[in-house]
Amino acid sequence: KYWLLFYLARSPCRDLCQKNLHLMRQIHIALGKNSAQEKYALVQVAHSKDRIKNEHRQQDPHLLNYFISDKEFHKFFSVSRFKQSAEGYYLVDPLGRIILYYPPHARGEAIYQDLSHLLAHLTTG
């Protein structure tokens, strides 16, 4: 079981999205030995024709890359406590619960500090 930090964005992944993918990679590296407990992903809301584009995986083999439809996107927000169209970072615990949200312009240091603290101090059974 692992923690998942994912970035939710509309496809295609443009400048801000690219910057935030780089930031997630840097956070993962900065976690050091605790990085084995964390994975990171890009979740893109895409039309089916966009699903074949998977260039991010080639640039970063550790990045998990998922595509969801508009319908899946709307369903996600209908059952979550987050605002519709909330592009940004989401932190999921090992039990599959979304516990934190960070806006797209969040500071990497804040995300790193929260994640580092959780990995160092919390265990789930």
Language-model segment annotations:
Residues 8-11, 43-46, 103:
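Structural motif
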